[in-house]
């Protein structure tokens, strides 16, 4: 059904994204988003299609999705509709693009960071071709707004798999939103107080602070603030490192420079 047909079927609706085919149907105090099957036109900026076309064909809608685990549907008559192996990838805990990974990332560069975020939240692995496509297309992330990148990064670092942020370094993606992280991972800490390099130490700090925040019942806003503090608390160490005559590393004034 197209948005006009959906609105005609229900007494109370809200046009939450009607230009993209989305109408919120209100039943009592609860809202349910109903989105018409869509086909995307040509993408012009590695982010947005020039036009969105409605279609009655579910297959056309599913093939425009980003990852196989997001390209399944359910019909009460036929059950799960799974044209791209999403169910198998769920069972194997794999993030895989629908169709050609390079094409999916050419269409929308944010999908690269979303894939890593899903890997963290679900504690899945990136399928090899998806990983390699992110590596190739990483420079196109410059077409994505800082706000959208921040949203994905925030969801990643407060997740159970926050250490999947390493995938952003391994693919070269972090160079376009957090270039300091690669330097942190390359900075060793030769002193009695640390057993990790700066980067792995910071990732471990995020993991611990997430666990503590969950145990303490912190609100999401508080957990986000603490996760970013853990991520960035040693961000200036690579530029402040000094090694004394005994081979001990010092990072004088790194908190001030980091702030």
Indicate residue ranges for each PLM-predicted region.
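Catalytic cores of the polymerase beta-like nucleotidyltransferase superfamily
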Residues: 1-259
């Amino acid at each position: 059904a197209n948005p006009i047909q959906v609105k005609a079927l229900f007494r109370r609706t809200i046009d939450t994204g009607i230009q993209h085919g989305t109408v919120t149907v209100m039943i009592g105090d609860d809202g349910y988003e109903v989105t018409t099957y869509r086909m995307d036109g040509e993408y012009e900026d590695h982010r947005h299609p020039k036009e969105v076309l409605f279609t009655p064909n579910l297959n056309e809608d599913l093939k425009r999705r980003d990852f196989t685990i997001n390209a399944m549907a359910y019909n009460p008559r036929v059950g799960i509709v799974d044209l791209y192996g999403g169910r198998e990838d769920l069972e194997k805990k794999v993030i895989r693009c629908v169709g050609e990974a390079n094409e999916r990332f050419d269409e929308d560069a944010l999908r690269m960071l979303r894939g890593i975020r899903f890997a963290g939240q679900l504690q899945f692995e990136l399928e090899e071709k998806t990983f390699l496509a992110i590596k190739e297309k990483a420079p196109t992330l410059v077409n994505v707004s800082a706000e959208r990148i921040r949203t994905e990064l925030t969801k990643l670092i407060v997740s159970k798999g926050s250490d999947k942020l390493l995938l952003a370094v391994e693919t070269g993606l972090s160079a376009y939103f957090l270039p300091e992280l690669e330097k942190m991972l390359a900075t060793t800490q030769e002193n009695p107080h640390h057993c990790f390099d700066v980067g792995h130490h910071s990732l471990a700090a995020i993991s611990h602070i997430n666990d503590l925040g969950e145990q303490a019942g912190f609100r999401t806003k508080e957990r986000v603030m603490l996760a970013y503090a853990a991520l960035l608390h040693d961000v200036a160490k690579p530029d402040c490192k000094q090694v004394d005559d005994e081979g001990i590393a010092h990072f004088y004034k790194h908190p001030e420079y980091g702030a």
